Every structure is written in structure tokens, then in C-alpha cells.
């Protein structure tokens, strides 16, 4: 899982 803005 990865999250980036």
C-alpha cells in the first residue's frame, strides 16, 4: 500500500 499527494 502506498499513499502520496
UniProtKB/Swiss-Prot annotation:
Q: Where in the cell is it found?
A: Secreted
* Any single GO BP term: neuropeptide signaling pathway
Q: Which UniProt keywords apply?
A: Amidation, Neuropeptide, Secreted
Predominant cellular place of this UniProt entry's protein: secreted
Report the residues modified as Leucine amide. 5
Q: Which Gene Ontology cellular-component terms appear in the entry?
A: extracellular region
Q: Which family does it belong to?
A: Belongs to the allatostatin family.
Give the function comment from the record: May act as a neurotransmitter or neuromodulator.
User: What is the name listed in the Swiss-Prot or TrEMBL entry for this protein?
Assistant: Carcinustatin-14
Amino acid at each position: 500500500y502506498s499513499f502520496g499527494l
